[in-house]
Amino acid sequence: MSGTRCLRQLPVRSVPRATIQEALGQRRFQSSKGSTYGAAKKLFKAYPYSVSLASMFILFGAGGLVFVNYYYHAYIIGAFKQFPEPVAKELRKALYFTNQDLKPHQAIKFYKKTLRVAEEIGMDPFSDEVLGIKIQLAAFMEKIQKYHKAIQVLEIVRNDCLDWIEEFGDKPENVGKRTRILEKTVAISLKIGELYSGEYVKEPELAEEKLVWAVETTLRELQRRETEGVKPGEGKWLNREQIGASLEALGNNYEAQDQHYLASPLFLQAINMSPPKSCHTAVLMNNLSISVAQQTPPSIPGQAPVSRPTLVNNARAWAIKAIDVATNIAPPERTEECDLACAVATHNLGEFAEMDGDIAAARLKYDEAKSLSKVMGFTEGISNADAALKRLSKK
């Protein structure tokens, strides 16, 4: 496969990250170079592999986190609309000091005042609007790098939602509201998990707790509906891509802890939930490839362990699938995730060839990955390919 087939016709251009208000108007996940590439420096990781000095790339949740963040803004907060004027007046002030004239103390003051006025005039504390204000406050805390404060706000909202579901969710007149609040609680849990696992908090066990809850709750609700049927007025549950996002988020958390044997089945389930012809599916396939390659599964009595060559061959097959999927997607469906998946999976094929001792094939793949990265302006890909080629020159 030639490198030119692996890329879009035009080089990727940076897309400004949408403001919260702009994101609210969108109705489907859209990747952007700003979000994916901005995450790449953190999310592309080099891992030692066995006795080899080779290192491999993993698109460590770039698309998944974008999906979670999109869902967090577009589906949790909902459009800031239908606010009574006394509430809207204070909210406009809070947003002004958030987006126009950044003054954290003033912004926080007006967010709190907005919530106080909403309570005074009797707005439903579990309406999209009021929950949205609280989650916007958490998003602002994240924006000003007060990550623990953001988590604290979201934990309070999550606990309030769980309390409501436990006390009122089983009442027949509340079935639709229960669905809406449970969806939001799942998405809030995913966001909390993301924050806990981030480089500024680094609490993987707490992240795992929230992510496991989100996955189990999502699948349990899906199974209940399939078994019992959807109740009148209950409304739709999360779609397949949203369910896949929760699976991917948990997989990323296990991957970060080098628990690859736990991450792999989650990536596989996420692939099954993802549209077969999407760039994010290619990313997931690449991630599964790396997760499989790095596995050292715990021994099971009475079962022979999977051999290293078998794991590498399986990993190679998934990397090839990632390239095939990304190659055959054309604009407008094609996004920069396809380009990243192509470049990274190509580099990883070089790693697999190097592990097999096929230096010529490895060099070919590293050169191809470097060329792809150059066209994209992906500096991390270029530097890693250069490092791999330098390593080969010493063999």
Language-model features: locations:
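Flexible helix-coil transition and linker loops at the boundaries of alpha-helical arrays
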Residues: 79-80, 118-128, 160-183, 200, ...
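Single-pass hydrophobic alpha-helical transmembrane segments typical
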Residues: 36-79
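Residue-level detector of the short coil/turn that links helix A to helix B
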Residues: 102, 145, 200-202, 258, ...
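N-terminal topogenic membrane-targeting module
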Residues: 69-148, 153, 161
